[in-house]
Design a protein with these regions (language model features):
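Glycine-enriched alpha-helix->loop->beta-strand junction motifs that scaffold or abut catalytic
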Residues: 283-289, 305-314, 347-350, 372-373
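Divalent metal-coordination and catalytic microenvironments
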Residues: 7, 31, 97, 151, ...
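Phosphate/diphosphate-binding loops
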Residues: 176-216, 291-296, 300, 326-352
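Histidine/acidic-residue-rich catalytic or RNA/ligand-binding cores of hydrolases
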Residues: 14, 98, 164, 168, ...
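Divalent metal-binding segments
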Residues: 1-197, 217, 224-271, 275, ...
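Short acidic/histidine-rich active-site segments
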Residues: 226, 264-273, 315-317, 344-367, ...
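C-terminal cap of metal-dependent C-N hydrolases
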Residues: 363, 373-451
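Long hydrophobic segments that form regular secondary structure
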Residues: 243-285, 398, 402-421
Length: 451
């Protein structure tokens, strides 16, 4: 069967394919060297507009040494009056210069960092300007083709935007290379209800490819920004911090109740163990159905609750690979189990796998590899091997039908391969499966054929 990515920010992933990527920077200085070269290249090409933001993606300052962290002075020295905004890999904070801070209307201190809800609001302002819509459509088409080349037939899109109207417009323009479930954020939920939408409704003009998704809510922050809400303090951080909630428990419950009473599933981001407990408590009180997004650290007593409440765990196995060293650094004494994939499965929880692109690349084979082998390289020991999944479970969690084979009557969403992934024995080989994709079919139509 064709593959699904159950957690994407599809517009931001498309932009990533055409923006400065800072994922390999090992310090603030290295990131700024990459930025300096990028600015020089664009200046030489005549594509640098002083009225438009220069945007970079995916820096990981949680892995940088304490004396190699972002500062406002350092980024200002490199960028001058050119507005520059850099997004962290987890998209939960940004590093901006003074020119961008003024233009965005955000306050920055000595670090130059903007976090959580303030950053989410600011980030949405970065993609405005002449020609932006045409350029975005070009990038979106490239992103759909890139996904199809990996065997992907569908995504859940949790872009922070007017997602329903956006995808209706995109389908009307012929952007039809994927099935899309378009999520709705809490601040737009009432409008969606007033417009008569419910989870599962078909988007007009999509020819059955587009549907309204769940109400996506972010309950807490992230591990890399030390803002995931935990019941025990982060290791080595002064002053002591437990992370933060994006909404109060009362607000979380209120939004869940509103969604549930009006035909919307919920997709609630929860990373820290205490955030997961709060979200599960709210779901239990409201009868909400849908998924917990990430479920990165769970108290042992909470693991069986997802299955009991009928909630899926929407997991991103590549995050475990990216975070394994950060976990050791900041979750030294956790009250819960991080990345409890196997424990959730054994408890009867439905698993849905995704990337959270652009946090990790939109590539289900990468997610499957991380889930099965627990490491990116045969040269490194698996991370928590007891939580690894078998291949059949990982593959089934990456399809729309929840199984590894097609039957007569199934939708003709499929991927053809010239190698059998079930026989793969190394993470490197599983991660190279995209080169074995011969073709991808969506609703009986080829969206990718290898030449």
């Amino acid at each position: 069967p064709g593959l699904w990515d159950y957690h994407t920010h599809f517009t931001q992933w498309a932009y990533t394919l055409g923006r400065l990527d800072l994922i390999d920077a090992r310090s603030a200085d290295e990131a700024l060297d990459m930025l300096r070269a990028h600015l020089a290249e664009r200046h030489a090409a005549g594509t640098l507009d002083p009225d438009q933001y220069v945007v970079g993606m995916r820096f990981r300052h949680s892995l940088w040494a304490d004396d190699a962290q972002p500062t406002l002075a350092a980024i200002d020295a490199v960028t001058g009056d050119q507005p520059v905004a850099l997004s962290s890999a987890d998209m939960h904070c940004g590093w901006v210069n003074s020119a961008a801070a003024r233009k965005l209307g955000v306050h920055v201190g000595e670090s130059g960092l903007v976090g959580e809800l303030e950053w989410f609001d600011a980030y949405c302002k970065l993609d405005k300007g002449p020609g932006a819509a045409d350029e975005l459509m070009r990038l979106l088409r490239n992103a759909e083709l890139d996904a199809a080349s990996k065997g992907v037939v569908g995504v859940r899109d949790y872009e922070m935007a007017e997602n329903i109207d956006t995808w209706i417009d995109r389908f009307s323009q012929g952007l039809d290379g994927l099935r899309v479930q378009a999520g709705v954020y809490p601040e737009r939920l009432q409008q969606a209800i007033d417009d008569g939408w419910h989870t599962g409704d078909e988007l007009p003009g999509s020819h059955g490819l587009g549907h309204v998704g769940a109400m996506k809510m972010i309950s807490d922050g992230s591990l890399n920004t030390r803002s995931a809400y935990c019941s025990t303090p982060y290791s080595g951080i002064a002053p002591e911090t437990f992370g933060t909630l994006s909404y109060t428990p009362e607000q979380i419950e209120s939004y869940m109740r509103l969604a549930t009473e009006h035909g919307f599933d919920i997709a609630c981001h929860a990373i820290g163990d205490e955030a997961n407990t709060i979200v599960l408590d709210c779901a239990e009180r409201t009868g909400a159905h849908g998924s917990i997004e990430h479920a990165q650290m769970l108290k042992e007593r909470d693991i069986p609750r997802l299955a009991r409440l009928g909630l899926a765990a929407s997991i991103q196995p590549q995050h475990a690979m990216d975070d394994r060293d950060v976990i050791t650094r900041f979750w030294g004494n956790p009250a819960g189990i991080p990345y409890a994939f196997s424990a959730l499965r054994k408890a009867g929880t439905k698993l849905l796998m995704g990337s959270d692109a652009p946090v990790a690349p939109l590539d289900p084979w990468m997610a499957i590899s991380a889930a099965v082998f627990g490491t990116e390289s045969s040269d490194r020991e698996p991370f928590q091997p007891e939580q690894c999944l078998d291949f059949a479970t990982a593959l089934a969690s990456s399809t729309a039908i929840g199984r590894t084979t097609l039957k007569a009557g199934d939708a003709a969403d499929l991927v053809l391969l010239d190698a059998d992934p079930s026989t793969v024995r190394t993470p490197e080989s599983m991660r190279s499966m995209p080169k074995h994709v011969v073709g991808t079919m969506l609703a009986g139509r080829w969206t990718y054929q290898r030449r």
